[in-house]
Regions:
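Walker A (P-loop) phosphate-binding loop of ABC-type ATPase nucleotide-binding domains
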Residues: 35-39
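Conserved catalytic motifs of ABC-family nucleotide-binding domains
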Residues: 151
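Conserved ABC transporter NBD signature motif
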Residues: 56-64, 71-72
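Hydrophobic anchor residue at the start of the ABC signature
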Residues: 144
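Helix-to-loop junction immediately C-terminal to a conserved catalytic motif
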Residues: 48
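Conserved ABC ATPase "signature" region
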Residues: 96, 100-103, 108-126
């Protein structure tokens, strides 16, 4: 269970992006929708431990994610609206690199994970192609594969 308690984030220019957000999210797959400027990206970056909220607490299965960021990074699949990738790297190589970062140490397990995900998102035939050459839809599918690495508890 992901629990946010009174999470607030105020940027240096005094813009209040989050104001006392309190919610519980069970394991599963979720999307976050809202108008421009509603704080969606700020909330997701805080959950993913990419930035620290100004105040409040975020826990995942009772673990303080700000104190132990690796605990959630290993169990979270995150697909931001704009995900930066190295455009000249192939889809296969990038997913393999991401698998290493997610803690998949064994080369056989990494190979199986990457090949399975590329097949699931229908990118197997272009696995050796640089991501820069992908269409917008192909990049989105690549991002989905990236978010699914390591069979995360929360996506």
């Amino acid at each position: 269970m992901l629990t946010l308690t009174d999470v607030t984030h105020v940027y240096p220019n005094n813009t209040r992006a989050l104001d006392g957000v309190t919610l519980e999210i069970p394991r599963g797959m979720y999307g976050l929708l809202g108008p421009n400027g509603a704080g969606k990206s700020t909330l997701m970056r805080s959950i993913a431990t990419l930035q620290t909220p100004s105040s409040g607490a975020i826990t995942f299965d009772g673990i303080d994610v700000m104190a132990e960021p690796e605990a959630i990074r290993a169990r979270l699949g995150y697909l931001p609206q704009d995900f930066g990738v190295y455009p000249r790297v192939t889809a296969y190589d990038m997913l393999e690199h991401m698998a290493v970062l997610k803690g998949i140490a064994g080369s056989a397990e990494r190979k199986e994970t990457v090949e399975t995900l590329l097949n699931q998102v229908n990118l197997w035939k272009v696995r050796k192609k640089a991501i820069a050459g992908f269409s917008g839809g192909m990049r989105q599918r690549f991002g989905i594969a990236q978010a699914l690495i390591g069979n995360p508890d929360l996506i």
